[in-house]
């Protein structure tokens, strides 16, 4: 229930707001403050705390609750500590004050993405430990930097290190999205981010002339081809009510560059695109399509990748899979309606799945508008607290999954 008296605020909400006040905003996150906070949580909960610096200044913090059978693969609970920038002038309240209004809404950057989930992990573990529970499987909580700018100095490097292998993760949970309906969205895969820069070269000259074979003309052809593809995918999504956004490939033109003066036709121009490639797309064939679009535009048109992820994996969502059966069974026992989807953007789950670990993205926020990265990002305290209850049930089920075929 919503608490209007600050002195009677639920301790989990107080802890959540404390974490939100640590300004881990890109591009200069206070990672040190977050690590200190997590070290104190580990001390209070009686958990081991390991810090792994993957590159100078970028530390993965791992809190561990050992299971009764440490030979079994573990449960990995991942969350990122950084948050995206804000435009304070568009916020009703300071985005790093964690202001709670009279209705119980907590306004803060990271309230949905994804500090709520971090605290829900911690508070679920606290509750289970305080009740005297022990489970066969070890639970590791990883708190990683850099996710909001691609995870290249965070999870992407961490999964390649021996410290990650030592966790022996058998199944992972990570972030999802809010759902404005009564249902809860769970993500079993995600689209692959391709950031593509197309460069067109052509004949320069004085802008008063009809110059042939200009960079702009050829770049226009590529842009038209890509935007025509975009429209085709948009119509495919709109025509099928059963399709969700993550099931189609999206693309947006995000940057145009070129030119030195109004009266000079430039020799070089470029356009940058953000593709989010659906996981069922043939990646090699799609790259060849990009090549064809450039070739069809004329000589001197090339493309390069600023980011390219080509290892999409799908976590099984049928009851024959023991992990899905445990996850969905626990949700059913709590009377939760699940809507499995493909995540439309990118999270650190892609790196976890790419090394062969099944992962689901799940942020238990129903009846909540999707406000991640938006002005006035907020979460109601009742929704947050119910999320603690939900994760308590999920951890009990997942950490109790019996030995599977092939596990030692």
UniProtKB/Swiss-Prot annotation:
<feature type="binding site">
    <location>
        <position position="373"/>
    </location>
    <ligand>
        <name>Zn(2+) 2</name>
    </ligand>
</feature>
<keyword id="KW-0378">Hydrolase</keyword>
<comment type="function">
    <text>Catalyzes the hydrolysis of N-acetylated amino acids to acetate and free amino acids.</text>
</comment>
<comment type="similarity">
    <text>Belongs to the peptidase M20A family.</text>
</comment>
<dbReference type="InterPro" id="IPR011650">
    <property type="entry name" value="Peptidase_M20_dimer"/>
</dbReference>
<feature type="active site">
    <location>
        <position position="82"/>
    </location>
</feature>
<keyword id="KW-0963">Cytoplasm</keyword>
<dbReference type="InterPro" id="IPR002933">
    <property type="entry name" value="Peptidase_M20"/>
</dbReference>
<dbReference type="GO" id="GO:0046872">
    <property type="term" value="F:metal ion binding"/>
</dbReference>
<dbReference type="GO" id="GO:0004046">
    <property type="term" value="F:aminoacylase activity"/>
</dbReference>
<dbReference type="GO" id="GO:0005737">
    <property type="term" value="C:cytoplasm"/>
</dbReference>
<feature type="binding site">
    <location>
        <position position="175"/>
    </location>
    <ligand>
        <name>Zn(2+) 1</name>
    </ligand>
</feature>
<dbReference type="InterPro" id="IPR010159">
    <property type="entry name" value="N-acyl_aa_amidohydrolase"/>
</dbReference>
<protein>
    <recommendedName>
        <fullName>Aminoacylase-1</fullName>
        <ecNumber>3.5.1.14</ecNumber>
    </recommendedName>
</protein>
<dbReference type="Pfam" id="PF01546">
    <property type="entry name" value="Peptidase_M20"/>
</dbReference>
<dbReference type="GO" id="GO:0006520">
    <property type="term" value="P:amino acid metabolic process"/>
</dbReference>
<dbReference type="InterPro" id="IPR036264">
    <property type="entry name" value="Bact_exopeptidase_dim_dom"/>
</dbReference>
<feature type="binding site">
    <location>
        <position position="80"/>
    </location>
    <ligand>
        <name>Zn(2+) 1</name>
    </ligand>
</feature>
<dbReference type="InterPro" id="IPR001261">
    <property type="entry name" value="ArgE/DapE_CS"/>
</dbReference>
<dbReference type="InterPro" id="IPR052083">
    <property type="entry name" value="Aminoacylase-1_M20A"/>
</dbReference>
<feature type="binding site">
    <location>
        <position position="113"/>
    </location>
    <ligand>
        <name>Zn(2+) 2</name>
    </ligand>
</feature>
<keyword id="KW-0479">Metal-binding</keyword>
<keyword id="KW-0862">Zinc</keyword>
<feature type="active site" description="Proton acceptor">
    <location>
        <position position="147"/>
    </location>
</feature>
<feature type="binding site">
    <location>
        <position position="148"/>
    </location>
    <ligand>
        <name>Zn(2+) 2</name>
    </ligand>
</feature>
<dbReference type="Pfam" id="PF07687">
    <property type="entry name" value="M20_dimer"/>
</dbReference>
<comment type="subunit">
    <text>Homodimer. Interacts with SPHK1.</text>
</comment>
<feature type="binding site">
    <location>
        <position position="113"/>
    </location>
    <ligand>
        <name>Zn(2+) 1</name>
    </ligand>
</feature>
């Amino acid at each position: 229930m919503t608490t209007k008296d600050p002195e009677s605020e639920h301790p989990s909400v107080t802890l959540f707001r404390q974490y939100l006040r640590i300004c881990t905003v890109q591009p200069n996150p206070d990672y040190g403050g977050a690590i200190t906070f997590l070290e104190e949580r580990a001390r209070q909960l009686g958990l081991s705390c390991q810090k792994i610096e993957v590159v100078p200044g970028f530390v993965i913090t791992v809190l561990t609750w050992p299971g009764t059978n440490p030979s079994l693969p573990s449960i990995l609970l991942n969350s990122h500590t950084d948050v995206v920038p804000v435009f304070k002038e568009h916020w009703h309240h300071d985005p790093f004050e964690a202001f709670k209004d009279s209705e119980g809404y907590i306004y803060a950057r990271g309230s949905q993405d994804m500090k709520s989930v971090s605290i829900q992990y911690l508070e679920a573990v606290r509750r289970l430990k305080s009740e005297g529970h022990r489970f066969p499987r070890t639970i590791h909580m990883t708190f990683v930097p850099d996710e909001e700018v691609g995870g290249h100095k965070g999870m992407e490097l961490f999964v390649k290190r021996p410290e990650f292998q030592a966790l022996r993760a058998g199944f992972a949970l990570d972030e999802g999205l809010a759902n404005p309906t009564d249902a809860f969205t769970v993500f079993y895969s995600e689209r692959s981010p391709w950031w593509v820069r197309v460069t067109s070269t052509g004949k320069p000259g004085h802008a008063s002339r009809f110059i042939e074979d200009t960079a702009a003309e050829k770049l226009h052809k590529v842009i038209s081809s890509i935007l025509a593809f975009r429209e085709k995918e948009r119509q495919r999504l709109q025509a099928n009510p059963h399709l969700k956004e993550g099931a189609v490939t999206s693309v947006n033109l995000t940057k145009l560059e070129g030119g030195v003066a109004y009266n000079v036709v430039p020799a070089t121009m470029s356009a940058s695109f953000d593709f989010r490639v659906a996981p069922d797309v043939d990646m090699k064939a799609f790259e060849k399509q990009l090549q064809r679009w450039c070739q069809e535009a004329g000589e001197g048109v090339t493309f390069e990748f600023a980011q390219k992820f080509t290892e999409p994996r799908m976590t099984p969502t049928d009851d024959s899979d023991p992990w899905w059966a445990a996850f969905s069974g626990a949700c059913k026992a709590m009377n939760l309606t699940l809507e499995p989807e493909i995540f439309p953007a990118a999270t650190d789950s892609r790196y976890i799945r790419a090394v062969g670990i099944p992962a689901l993205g799940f942020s238990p926020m129903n009846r909540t508008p999707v406000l991640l990265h938006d002005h006035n990002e907020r979460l109601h305290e009742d929704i947050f607290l119910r999320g603690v209850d939900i994760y308590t049930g999920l951890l009990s089920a997942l950490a109790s999954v019996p030995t599977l075929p092939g596990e030692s």
